[in-house]
């Protein structure tokens, strides 16, 4: 079973409009509300793929209750309740544009953060792989993910970590390393303080920087150009076919689902990389975020090429 961790989930609200009118009333007929957050996208895709998954994280208030109730009933859930209220994230879809209004979310009390570590530690006993995704809520220290990784390391559970900015920097500078990280070029540039291109020779050099020492897998998305990956001392390039992209949001989370599944099933490097890329591509072909149509899985799988470089 895979444990997904979403520390800052949200209720994702979609307001479709023909036109967004400023400084007046806009009436919405078809409102969509879903349980949101990067980790919950991972959860949905794993469930649709057929893997056993347990979802955890922090929820609070009536919105937190709504969120838990609106996670697929087939998914096991064990969230930790806090005093603060789970946030709303609003997307206004008008014409070909999307305007987002994102609430900051709750401020987590210090004791709540400590108590969740104990909650997490107990959940580790019943899972084989951990996937940690998304931002940290206010109130938690920037190195909080390093604490989760430390507990998972102590329990012998591999960790797929998908975060960015200061939270990722803190983990990389910690002695406690995740098994997998999946930065994109922009995030690599931010971490290193210099521009990083998609040139394969440059990426090889970058992924051997001291900052990334101790990370078993580093998987870098190159968008339509596929993926570059480092596993131990071996480098890979994944070539992908061109597809019709409907909604790319959530494709990174679907990729995390594939990586986590590959670790769970102890697949070969090539199998893990292909699965991860296929799930990311399947998500991009769907209107709904964090959703894959498994009927198209094998056709895409057969088109991907993994090369050692």
Curated annotation (Swiss-Prot):
HAMAP family for the chain: LacC
NCBIfam families documented for this protein: 1-PFK, lacC, PRK13508.1
Class of this enzyme: transferase
GO terms under cellular component: cytosol
Catalytic reaction(s) noted: D-tagatofuranose 6-phosphate + ATP = D-tagatofuranose 1,6-bisphosphate + ADP + H(+)
EC number of this enzyme: 2.7.1.144
Secreted found in the keyword field: no
Pathway this chain belongs to: Carbohydrate metabolism; D-tagatose 6-phosphate degradation; D-glyceraldehyde 3-phosphate and glycerone phosphate from D-tagatose 6-phosphate: step 1/2
Biological process per Gene Ontology, one example term: D-tagatose 6-phosphate catabolic process
Keyword Nucleotide-binding recorded: yes
Entry keywords, A to Z: ATP-binding, Kinase, Lactose metabolism, Nucleotide-binding, Transferase
Protein name as annotated: Tagatose-6-phosphate kinase
């Amino acid at each position: 079973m895979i444990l997904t961790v979403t520390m800052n989930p949200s209720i994702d609200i979609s307001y479709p409009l023909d036109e967004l009118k400023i400084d007046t009333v806009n009436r919405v007929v078809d409102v969509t509300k879903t349980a949101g957050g990067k980790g919950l996208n991972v959860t949905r895709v794993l469930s649709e793929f057929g893997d056993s998954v347990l979802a955890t994280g922090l929820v609070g208030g009536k919105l937190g209750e709504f969120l838990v109730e609106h996670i697929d009933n087939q998914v096991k859930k064990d969230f930790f309740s806090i005093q603060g209220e789970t946030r709303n994230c609003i997307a206004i879809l008008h014409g070909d544009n999307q305007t987002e209004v994102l609430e900051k979310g709750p401020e987590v009390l210090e004791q709540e953060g400590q108590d969740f570590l104990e909650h997490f530690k107990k959940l580790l006993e019943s899972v084989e792989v951990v996937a940690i995704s998304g931002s940290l809520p206010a109130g938690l220290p920037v190195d909080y993910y390093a604490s989760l990784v430390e507990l998972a390391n102590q329990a012998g559970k591999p960790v797929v970590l998908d975060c960015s900015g200061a939270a990722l920097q803190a983990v990389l500078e910690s002695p406690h390393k995740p098994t997998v990280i999946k930065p994109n070029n922009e995030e690599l540039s931010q971490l290193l303080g210099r521009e990083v291109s998609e040139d394969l020779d440059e990426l090889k050099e970058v992924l051997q920087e001291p900052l990334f020492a101790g990370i078993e897998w580093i998987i870098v998305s190159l968008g339509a150009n596929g993926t570059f990956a480092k596993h131990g001392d071996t480098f890979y390039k994944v070539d992908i076919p061109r597809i019709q992209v409907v909604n790319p949001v959530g494709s990174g989370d679907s990729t995390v689902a594939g990586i986590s599944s590959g670790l769970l099933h102890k697949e070969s490097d090539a199998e893990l990389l292909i699965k991860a890329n296929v799930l990311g591509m399947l998500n991009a072909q769907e209107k709904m975020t964090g959703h894959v149509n498994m009927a198209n899985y094998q056709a895409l799988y057969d088109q991907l090429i993994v090369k050692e470089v």
